[in-house]
């Protein structure tokens, strides 16, 4: 919903989905206090959405605080949850606690691998309601219309790439900022050598 994060809601609409309700919860900061406030705003917004829409089921993907707020409000509203991507692990990330909490609140589970299915079952969930279906996001990678030429990609990201380019992504530990800074510095040193 936020322009600074790419307005991905537009991509959902472009894929032909109608959005019945949006819930705005972002704060101007990403401090722990602001994140807690965002969860509170999410609880308010999602509780209103669940009450207004009265769905048969809520489908929640992932492990972020926004998903956690939606799941908590759904449980309180009596809306059963189908959780996508439960059972996974991200050591050192607060997402781990959110993901497993959402899993425990969910009525039905769609995991990305058999291993994660087993983990959800080990958490006490009914095996008859836990399905290993793969990662739904990977289906988009097989679409030729998503491929870009180098020139199109440079235009899209508003950046001219060097002759040889490397893309590096890093998922920092959200529970240990000092370790994250140290690890990222190690990545930069490795790239420079």
Where are these regions (language model features)?
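Short beta-strands and strand-loop turn motifs
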Residues: 23-28, 81-86, 134, 167-172
């Amino acid at each position: 919903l936020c322009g600074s994060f790419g307005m991905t809601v537009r991509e959902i609409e472009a894929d032909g989905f109608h959005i019945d309700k949006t819930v705005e919860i972002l704060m101007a900061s990403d401090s722990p206090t602001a994140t807690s406030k965002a969860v509170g705003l999410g609880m308010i917004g999602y509780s209103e959405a669940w009450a207004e829409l009265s769905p048969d089921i809520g489908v929640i993907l992932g492990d972020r605080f926004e998903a956690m707020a939606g799941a908590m409000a759904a449980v309180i509203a009596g809306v059963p949850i189908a959780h996508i991507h439960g059972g996974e692990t991200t050591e050192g990330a607060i997402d781990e606690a959110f993901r497993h909490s959402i899993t425990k609140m969910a009525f039905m589970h769609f995991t990305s691998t058999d291993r994660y299915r087993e983990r959800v079952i080990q958490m006490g969930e009914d095996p008859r309601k836990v399905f290993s279906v793969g990662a739904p996001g990977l289906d988009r990678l097989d679409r030729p219309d998503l491929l870009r030429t180098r020139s199109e990609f440079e235009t899209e990201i508003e950046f001219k790439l060097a002759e040889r380019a490397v893309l590096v992504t890093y998922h920092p530990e959200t529970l240990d900022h000092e370790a994250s800074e140290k690890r990222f510095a190690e990545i930069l040193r490795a790239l420079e050598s």
